[in-house]
């Protein structure tokens, strides 16, 4: 699986910048792990199933956004969502819909950022700074963005800002989504690497365990194996580089 070129860090990564960035959080992937701690992944680049741990490289983008984003607003959104899925039986009336929506859109925007062509942003009539690689990494480590004399605003710095702005806009424009919990009576859910939105004419949904998925603007309900199959097919169609599950034999598609 290849990704666009990315700005590499210094040898030995002295400032401990995150290079391998999860598109879908490892905590969420771990909900689908088997007794060995791995998930079954269909890797589209090689057209076959493989077993991978939740921290595997296949689940990560290569420095597609900056450290400020990775360790700042993204962590806050993830933590709130983890609280929701770790307490999956919370009643519908007490469910934190906004926390689900923010994570859903963050996940999607990170997937887009993973696949996007990497280009720096240049500004007319704006002078930049002459900074060594070490100075750049120190600034990024401390949450700063900067414009370089020749390279402008580096792609991953711009991407972190863009994701944050787009996230706020999307959440505002879409308004309040009420997420119902679907429980599979038979069969288990597959998960796409990310979901590109309503491109396939389906309401947003998020598989959160082999047996559970949040589905936009519906009530909590149990679903049969045919409905599970329909959602799994949507996950496969939505996927870009891979899709995964706990046990292939239990996933109708």
Model-derived features: where do they sit?
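Alpha-helical structural context detector biased toward long hydrophobic helices
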Residues: 1-20, 24-253
